[in-house]
């Protein structure tokens, strides 16, 4: 178990290993300039059978690169027998998920506490 924090003024993330769940809190803007960093950080902590919970309550913007990273993490997690849940998706980013139809491939719950693995 452990927590790591990285970020700058426009983007930040906390990753906490909670046993069978990797909790990833994203702050700010998940865009092309930082999306590869998130992918690398999550992949470094992802093991077979581990679930991933994204707390997106403080994410204010996402672009196609950010969406692509989330989809890659979803694919890798499923390959390992785990599950990905997105929680607390805010209205602005939710529009991007809905327009691109990416919301159809993720389980999205209103709050972090609603996630069931």
PLM region spans:
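Amphipathic alpha-helical interaction surfaces in cytosolic regulatory modules
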Residues: 30-106
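Short alpha-helical segment
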Residues: 114-115
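STAS-typified acidic loop motif
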Residues: 4-40
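Short acidic-hydrophobic, aromatic-tinged amphipathic segments that line or gate anion-handling sites
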Residues: 107-111
């Amino acid at each position: 178990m452990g927590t790591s924090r990285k970020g700058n003024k426009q983007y930040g993330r906390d990753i906490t290993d909670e046993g069978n769940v990797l909790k990833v809190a994203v702050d700010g803007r998940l865009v092309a300039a930082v999306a590869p960093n998130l992918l690398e950080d999550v992949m470094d902590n992802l093991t077979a059978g581990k679930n991933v919970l994204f707390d997106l309550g403080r994410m204010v913007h996402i672009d196609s690169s950010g969406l692509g990273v989330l989809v890659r993490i979803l694919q890798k997690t499923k390959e390992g027998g785990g599950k990905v849940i997105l929680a607390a998706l805010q209205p602005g980013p939710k529009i991007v998920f809905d327009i691109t139809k990416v919301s159809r491939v993720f389980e999205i719950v209103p709050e972090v506490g609603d996630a069931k693995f």
